[in-house]
Amino acid sequence: MSNLENLTSKIIEDANKEAEKLLSEAKKEENEIVDEKVKKANKAKEQIIEKTKREAKTKAERVISNTHLKVRNNKLEAKQEMINKVFDEAVIKLQNLPQEEYLNFIKNSILSLDIEGDEEIIVSSNDKDKIDISFMLTLNNKLKDKGKKELLKISNENRDIKGGFILYKNGIEINNSFEALVDSLRDELEQEIIEALFS
C-alpha cells in the first residue's frame, strides 16, 4: 500500500473515530439534558401536586369552616325564634287576662308609678270599652288618697298596642303596653329562658 493510501486510510479512520467520539458525547449530552428535563418535569409535577393538595386542603377547611358557621348560625336563629315565641306567648297570655285581672293590672300599675294624677291613659281601640267611668272614678279616688291630683282621664287617641296602656302628659309618655313590659324584662329573663329551653 502506498503512503497516500495509508494517509487517506488514517485520515478516514481518525475522522470515523472523531465522529464516533462526537456522536458519543452528543448522545451523552442528550441523555444528560433529557435526564435534567425529566428531573425538572418531575419536580414541577411534585410541586404542582403539592400545591394542588394544599389548595384542596385549604378549600376543604374553608368549606368545613363555613359549614360549621352556617350550622351555628342556624342553631342561633332557631334558639332566637324559640325565645321570641316564648315572649310572644307571654304577650298573648297577658292579652287573654280576664277583664277583672286586666283592670286590676292597669290600676295597680298606674298607682305604682310616680305620676301627678292629671295624665291621659292611651289604650288600644280593643281595650277602650273595658275602661268605664266607674273604673276611672275608683282610680282617681285612689290617686287622691295618695295625695295626687284626681284628673286622670282616658285619651281620645288610640295606639296600636296589644294591651296595657301608655300614660301621656306634655309630650312625655310612659309606655306600659304589654309589648314594652315584656321587652323590658327580656334582657333579664333571656338567659333563664335559654337555660330552661336548651339545658
Swiss-Prot record:
Entry keywords, A to Z: ATP synthesis, Hydrogen ion transport, Ion transport, Transport
GO terms under cellular component: proton-transporting two-sector ATPase complex, catalytic domain
Pfam families, sorted: vATP-synt_E (PF01991)
Record-level GO BP terms: proton motive force-driven plasma membrane ATP synthesis
Top-level taxonomic group: Bacteria
Transport keyword on record: yes
GO molecular function: ATP binding; proton-transporting ATP synthase activity, rotational mechanism; proton-transporting ATPase activity, rotational mechanism
Keyword Heme: no
Stated family: Belongs to the V-ATPase E subunit family.
Functional note: Produces ATP from ADP in the presence of a proton gradient across the membrane.
Protein name: V-type proton ATPase subunit E
Protein species of origin: Clostridium botulinum (strain Loch Maree / Type A3)
